[in-house]
Every structure is written in structure tokens, then in C-alpha cells.
Amino acid sequence: EKLPLCEGSLCEMVRAKVSRTIQEKELEELKAKGAGTEDGEPIVVDELDADEVSRLLLEVDHERADIDPYDEKILTDPNRGHWDLWCDSEADGCPVLDLSYQGYVARNPRADINRNRIVAIDFGTKSTVVVYQNEDSRILPVRVGTGNVSKSIRAEHYENPTIIEFNDIESFLEAYAATLGRPATRWDDVYISHRAVDDLQSSLSTDYSAFFSELKQWAGDAGVKKAIRIRDRQDNDYLLKAFRELTDEDLNPIELYAYYLGLYINNMRNGIFLNYYLSFPVTYEFAVREKIAESFERGIKKALPEPLLRDEEIMRNFRINGSISEPAAYAVCALQEYGFEPEGNEEVFYSVFDFGGGTTDFDFGVWRESRAPKYDYTIEHFGA
């Protein structure tokens, strides 16, 4: 069956697929017939049949971020359903694409919000670790850019390299800006983490400028004033400003890295998370911490479904908490793992030396039983 007029995030992906799969002459014929105009009228996507769109729906996050395709039952199971088929009828830009006649089920992404669950992100110089709470309150790590998640797991898979590879920046940014949330970006345009490292190790020296692995140093170094030149694999040059001088319109690798982390965290397998904890080196100035947190917020929000982003009540509960230092975060985990459980007025004094991939931090403080009923312990840390 042929599809009706189409708008919205999913349809941007359909359009992208159309432009890549039909010949230029055929596309010009479609435009001549009024199948798309410069003033924003929707394109008729009848050159793709419903089976092809079904495949796109199942592979939507594989196309975006190399995440394993969803199983077919997500489209027809009344207790599941697909986010990209859902829209709020009163919302602007609500997609017209309706596949209910195929027996497909739309799912309101609000139903998948993991309330009171948290995500913790250790944004490291060489690698980044991400963990989240599942419905059983178990803490699970996330691996990014390793390809098929069913292949054998190694511990180092969860140390996600802090690196980004630019293949086609223009194509990526065009798609990234096209919709409010879950844009029709392509993984092949920008890689991060394990995939980017694999490519770096096999690349020629002439391709090194397509890789950027100093995200954290770039953000934290107050002495970096000159612009950094990035050249993608299409030989397009981009000047990357000093981090502190970036505006919201500038290319921001930290935001793009966070966007991909957001896709791996928030999807139709894991659900949606609104509470994030981000650790920082002790020595980072408050303004830098705040700007990094803002970059993560923009990137992670971009990975969320549009109905949530348009819901002010829900988004008031979205937060990036960046108040804890990296050594203090380690102290919280280590003290509990080693069985330090102070009671009453008992206090445990600690100090931590954190020899990281690019920085060395020191923190010291006091660990005691919490007086607040919703917490077990309180840590008072002083830094150095």
C-alpha cells in the first residue's frame, strides 16, 4: 500500500531514504508534480511502500546510532507500540503518517518514563562510563558504538572512548536541526566511541583531522584561545571555537557526543530517563562545569521524542546534576563497597587521589550517616 502525506521526525527519515534510493531524474519528476515545495509543503512518499516504512521503523535507531533493530512485535503488540508513530493531536507539526490501518500501534513515550530512576555519567578524558537504573533498581552499564550488542561482551566495552569522528558534518547538522527531537541523523555521518577508535587505528595520517579526541581537555583548558580546525571525510573544513566562546549555533562536539549517549540511554528498550548525574574534575571552574552540563543537556534532550520536549510539565523534571567531583563520586562507591557504614555520630574520614587519563585530582572529606530520611549517607567533600 502507498503512504499518505508525511511530516515529523519519522518522515524526515523517510524523505532521507527517498533521496538516497531513487534516481535524480525521478526525484525531479516528483517535484515537478508538486511532491514537495520550497515553502515547506510535505513530500508525497508513495515511492516507498508500507513494507519499506516498516523496516525503517524497526531500524530507526540502527540508522541513527548503530543500535540493534527492534523486533517486529513492537509494531503490532498492543502493550508495546512505536514512539515515532505517536503524536499529540494538538501539537504543532504533528505527523500525518498513520499506519493504524496496517495494525500498527503508536506508543505514547510518556508511558516509558522511568520515574525516580537515574543515569550517572563519568565524562572522562580518555573514556566515558554511563550507568543507569533498570526497573529492578539494578545498576547497568552502557556500551556505545560497539555494533551488535549480542556479540561477546568484554569489560573494556563499557569504557566508551571519548572521541568523535566526522565523516559528513554538513549532512549530519542539516538533519540534526530539522526537528526538535529524535532527528533523522545518520550514524554514517558522525561516529563516536568504539567505532571512532576502531577507525582511527586503521586510518591514514591524512584523515586524522576528521577525529577529535580531546573533548574534555578542550573544554577545561582556559589557555585554549585559538580555534581548532576539523576536516571531515568530505574534505570540508570547520573551525571549532574555544569551548568558552561557543554559542548555541556553533559546532559543539560535546553536545553531539551527549546526543549519541542520549540515544543509547533513551530508546524503546530502556525507556526514558529524566535525572542525570555528571561528574567533573575538582579543578574545573564553575563556569566550565556549567557549560559542559548545558552541552550535555542540549544533546541528551535532542535524543528524546518530540511529544516529551513539547510537554513543559514533564521537561520541568529533566535535570543534569553536575555538583559532584569525580574523586568524591568514587569515594561514595568505594566506601560502601568496602563496608564503611557509619551510624549515629560516627564519622569516616577519607582522601582520594584520582590519576585519570588527562588530569590528576585529589579530594578529601567526611562520610557519615544521613539525617535526611530519603538518604542513607551524607558525604561532605572539600576538594583540593
Residue ranges of predicted features:
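Oxyanion-binding/catalytic loops of NTP- or PPi-dependent enzymes
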Residues: 1, 102-206, 286, 290-384
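Conserved phosphate-binding loops in N-terminal lobes of ATP-dependent enzymes
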Residues: 1-55, 158-284
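Nucleic acid-processing catalytic cores of prokaryotic defense/repair systems
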Residues: 6-9, 14, 23-27, 31-44, ...
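N-terminal low-hydrophobic presequence detector
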Residues: 68, 279, 322-325
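A residue-identity detector for tryptophan
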Residues: 83-86, 187, 218, 367
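Short, isolated positions within intrinsically disordered regulatory regions of eukaryotic proteins
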Residues: 87-90, 191, 222, 371
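Short linear motifs at secondary-structure transitions and domain/linker junctions
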Residues: 93-97, 105-107, 251-256, 325-328
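Generic detector of short, locally flexible boundary/turn motifs and exposed helical patches
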Residues: 93-95, 239-246, 316-319
